Amino acid sequence: IHAASNASPNFFSRHPVEVIKSNMNGVDNLLSYGLRHGMKRFLFVSSGEVYGESDGRIFTEDYSGYVDCMSPRSCYPSSKRAAETLCVSYMSEYGAGVVIARPCHTYGPDFSENDNRVYAQFIRNALRGEDIVMKSTGSQFRSWSYVVDCASAILYILLKGKNGEAYNIADEASNISIRELAEITASMVGRKVVMEVPDETERKGYNPVSKSVYSV
């Protein structure tokens, strides 16, 4: 199971070259090593960012939307797309057994202090007794999955998935806007939602997709 990838939006804006190299080289190195050492199956943990811009439809596994290749922020979705293609190319050329998982936004109790994903920011605000700080309108609509459910789905795909196929990981009961997430978090600790202007680095790291809802 290859799940090693830096998913920090701040890292995307500051180190786009390293993001591309790590996503591509990681898959290449592991598949090459695995084939030399009797690998039975390889599962690549990709991302829903491969879907690109939404046209309003729910993201099914065969959907492919626009990604601006001239934007450094596209280092992440573009390299994840290329890494998926590399996986199936290894299958086609060398007979590797590969499956791909595309988790939606995953949340859980264990994250680093410098994690700047939106749910982590909200939880830190709540634990400190602060108002919940939003740095956008919060209209972005997302699918979410609890980390334990995501891990279970990854194992299921590894064992039961069809070679060369990609599978969404999502919970249709957990689709919510960023604004709603902020309001729920604020209500749990008796605080309010406030707006703050993001700095330039934060803005560059934001996912431009306004609606990211997965089929299940």
Regions found by a protein language model. Give the residues of each.
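Catalytic helix-loop patch of NAD(P)-dependent Rossmann-fold dehydrogenases
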Residues: 14-32, 36, 40-41, 50-101, ...
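Hydrophobic alpha-helix immediately C-terminal to the catalytic Tyr-X-X-X-Lys motif of short-chain
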Residues: 82, 86, 90, 122, ...
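Generic structural signal for alpha-helix termini and adjacent loop/cap motifs
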Residues: 6, 15, 33, 37, ...
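C-terminal substrate-binding subdomain of Rossmann-fold SDR/epimerase-dehydratase oxidoreductases
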Residues: 126-216
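Conserved NAD(P)H cofactor-binding loop of Rossmann-fold oxidoreductase domains
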Residues: 3-7, 46-47
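A conserved pocket-lining segment of Rossmann-fold NAD(P)-dependent short-chain dehydrogenase/reductase
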Residues: 12-13, 65-71, 98-110, 121-145, ...
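Small-residue (primarily alanine) positions within well-ordered alpha-helices
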Residues: 4-5, 34, 83, 153
